[in-house]
Amino acid sequence: MATGKSGGSSAEDLGHHAGYYRLPNTHDARLFYFFFESRGSKGEDDPVVIWLTGGPGCSSELALFYENGPFHIADNMSLVWNDFGWDQESNLIYVDQPTGTGFSYSSNPRDTRHDEAGVSNDLYAFLQAFFTEHPNFAKNDFYITGESYAGHYIPAFASRVYKGNKNSEGIHINLKGFAIGNGLTDPAIQYKAYTDYSLDMGLITKSQFNRINKIVPTCELAIKLCGTSGTISCLGAYVVCNLIFSSIETIIGKKNYYDIRKPCVGSLCYDLSNMEKFLQLKSVRESLGVGDIQFVSCSPTVYQAMLLDWMRNLEVGIPELLENDIKVLIYAGEYDLICNWLGNSRWVNSMEWSGKEAFVSSSEEPFTVDGKEAGILKSYGPLSFLKVHDAGHMVPMDQPKVALEMLMRWTSGNLSNASSSFQRLDFTM
């Protein structure tokens, strides 16, 4: 894919790849991906980072072109280098998943996924195919990253990789950590935080807060039922709990619930028309090899298929990974309502693991970039929580330099002054 590059370098020269892997153990599922080799000084030795966009059903091309990819799309449909693309510090993969998202497809509806077991098995199969084609990258440190509904995908995917390594199922994947940005991971805790966050930020009044909070106990009970009995109760939980969010949404009107400082424009609250136009161009489609597959930024079909998964708690698999020195970074832009920092901070602090007390009692420290405070960081051992200033739901879009700096320090074990000194005592991070 070499559209709009100066000097006419080919995509291969730049180390840019795009294509499909057909997944074994499916009827006909094909996952579409982009792979950008690192522009950094260590090049091929930089970590391999995979990015998953949420939705469920939203294409990772959203992140590629608007957040942390190598380039942005200009109004004249040319590509402009992104100085803060994560390929500056990593070998970067974007994948359209679950099947049916973005350019990924299957000719067989039985390949539609409804839960994290199906999603994580497909992602594991994708990685095996990727490292079979790129064996020189298999030895590198490997990190899973993403945002929003990827707060569900990522813990399940990380556990699947960990299990695959443990059981010697295929190529060993050198999993070192995962990062979730403004994710939905523990709905019982996070849905309860909606009213608190909205009141704190002046989005609702105290009487509105009291009224909406009456729904919370029913929501909590419904989530509990979903966790024990599954299926239909999970749909019930989705309906009941989203009354909390929709009540707030009605009150805030045209405000963007991904960034409460901004108005909501268009169906996804942002103008994504450049990407949609660019991906319809015949020349682009030919170079990507996607034929006439219809591209939608976010697939309603995939979203509907995952409804029963929505209210499940994905925090449960994380403690085992922490105990095995897998680094976990939860970060959140402070102006996002839908997956707000408050709810994320609460589930991180209430998670049961051997370092819980030490994490909870560890002091917050400023996260500084260019001598300015860019966020507030709390760390202990392999676990870190970072609240990012002046950012909404999409931190790499709102604070690109801070996000790149975060990735670089985290993957090299220097996110926190405290954690790097701690690391020598106990954990190999």
Swiss-Prot record:
Q: Does the keyword Disulfide bond apply?
A: yes
The Swiss-Prot or TrEMBL record annotates one GO molecular function as: serine-type carboxypeptidase activity
PROSITE patterns membership: CARBOXYPEPT_SER_HIS, CARBOXYPEPT_SER_SER
Q: What EC number(s) does its UniProt record assign?
A: 3.4.16.-
Q: Name one GO biological process term.
A: proteolysis
> Pfam families recorded for this chain?
Peptidase_S10
Xref: InterPro entries: AB_hydrolase_fold, Peptidase_S10, Ser_caboxypep_his_AS, Ser_caboxypep_ser_AS
Q: Which residues form the active site?
A: 148, 336, 393
Of the GO CC terms on this record, one is:
peroxisome
Q: Which residues bind substrate?
A: 339
According to the record, which residues are glycosylated? 76, 414, 417
Keyword Disulfide bond carried by entry: yes
Q: Which UniProt keywords apply?
A: Carboxypeptidase, Disulfide bond, Glycoprotein, Hydrolase, Protease, Signal
Q: What class of enzyme is it?
A: hydrolase
Top-level taxon of the source organism: Eukaryota
The organs and tissues expressing this protein are described as: Abundant in germinated embryos composed of leaf, root, and scutellum.
Q: List the disulfide bonds.
A: 58-298, 226-241, 264-269
- PANTHER family reported in the protein's UniProt record: SERINE CARBOXYPEPTIDASE-LIKE 49, SERINE PROTEASE FAMILY S10 SERINE CARBOXYPEPTIDASE
Q: Which family does it belong to?
A: Belongs to the peptidase S10 family.
Protein name, entry field: Serine carboxypeptidase-like
